[in-house]
From Swiss-Prot:
Region (Disordered): 80-100
Name under which the protein is recorded: Tachykinin-4
Top-level division of the source organism's lineage: Eukaryota
GO CC terms of this entry: extracellular space
């Protein structure tokens, strides 16, 4: 979805800049409909791809942050309230507490 929005914005910008370059206003007719093509420079494509990667990375970190998982790798054990791993067996006594 974000890539299609970016493409539409670029199409609008390219039509505006080509109209300014020619000195006369160019309009798209009904016959041009689905056959409108956009030519981009290699540098522009690379920068757009970098921006899309940053957006995807940001959304992935938001999602995994909300779900309690790490982005890089899978966390095997559940974390307790104090940041320590919870024991995998129920009813066992932690070594930190000991018998009092």
């Amino acid at each position: 979805m974000p890539s299609s929005v970016t493409l539409l914005l670029l199409m609008g910008l390219s039509v505006c800049t080509s109209a300014e370059d020619g000195g006369e206003e160019q309009t798209l007719g009904a016959e041009a409909g689905p056959w409108v093509t956009v030519t981009l420079e290699a540098g522009a494509v690379a920068s757009i791809q970098l921006q899309l990667q940053e957006v995807k990375r940001g959304k992935a970190s938001q999602f995994f942050g909300l779900m309690g998982k790490r982005v890089r790798g899978y966390q095997m054990g559940q974390r307790g309230l104090l940041g320590r791993r919870a024991s995998s067996t129920k009813g066992s006594v932690d070594e930190d507490q000991g018998a009092e």
